[in-house]
């Protein structure tokens, strides 16, 4: 039996085991997906090699720091210095990022994204990956609490700035994406409701709660909203394909996730 898993801190909230284990069953793959709450990342990666764990997802707070423990990075992962998927290839650990593609596919499920103006809040591992991927097809502004981190993405043709500049850019945006953890398990939002307008498409990468404060506010003014579960599903589907060669059933992933959340 092959073992796959998720490393991060915290990980107990994750829906990844529910999704991937359902997929292993569907496709008759002798494998299991588990979570590992990790305190010491370097030792955990040594354990992956020693135990022969076949593959990993990586979540907060390790998406960037994990890169220095790996043997090889995909071009995208190297460009943004962020990894959320690892393949163990006969003891050689190769890092990939599927966050950007996951976000793009989630958006494209609901709207045309090419040539649109996209405002991304947050320049951490997920925010960077989303900005890098969408910069290939759309106009991107990234705002971050630490502006220098957002400005470091300007090499990809995006504009970076401070979250304090939010009121200046919401009117410009066709799509707004919260790529921070603000709203996870709290009733907080980075975006005051008064700045939202009904033409805006609003996406949140947070999926617990499924309807964050940001999405509730956006719905209340008539915006189209995309919950964080869609991005989780599509980035997870890309990870599954890297591990198995199979692009999986995303509708099954959504269904089992909603059942676990009690919203099936």
UniProtKB/Swiss-Prot annotation:
Organism, scientific name: Pyrococcus abyssi (strain GE5 / Orsay)
This protein's pathway: Metabolic intermediate biosynthesis; chorismate biosynthesis; chorismate from D-erythrose 4-phosphate and phosphoenolpyruvate: step 4/7
Catalytic class of the enzyme: oxidoreductase
EC number: 1.1.1.25
Catalysis: reaction(s): shikimate + NADP(+) = 3-dehydroshikimate + NADPH + H(+)
Similarity-based family: Belongs to the shikimate dehydrogenase family.
A Gene Ontology BP annotation from the UniProt entry: aromatic amino acid family biosynthetic process
Keywords: Amino-acid biosynthesis, Aromatic amino acid biosynthesis, NADP, Oxidoreductase
Family matches, as InterPro entries: Aminoacid_DH-like_N_sf, NAD(P)-bd_dom_sf, SDH_C, Shikimate_DH, Shikimate_DH-bd_N, Shikimate_DH_fam, Shikm_DH/Glu-tRNA_Rdtase
Protein name: Shikimate dehydrogenase (NADP(+))
UniProt keyword annotation of Electron transport present: no
Single annotated GO MF: shikimate 3-dehydrogenase (NADP+) activity
Membrane-crossing residue ranges in chain numbering: none
Binding-site positions, NADP(+): 75, 122-126, 144-149, 205, 228
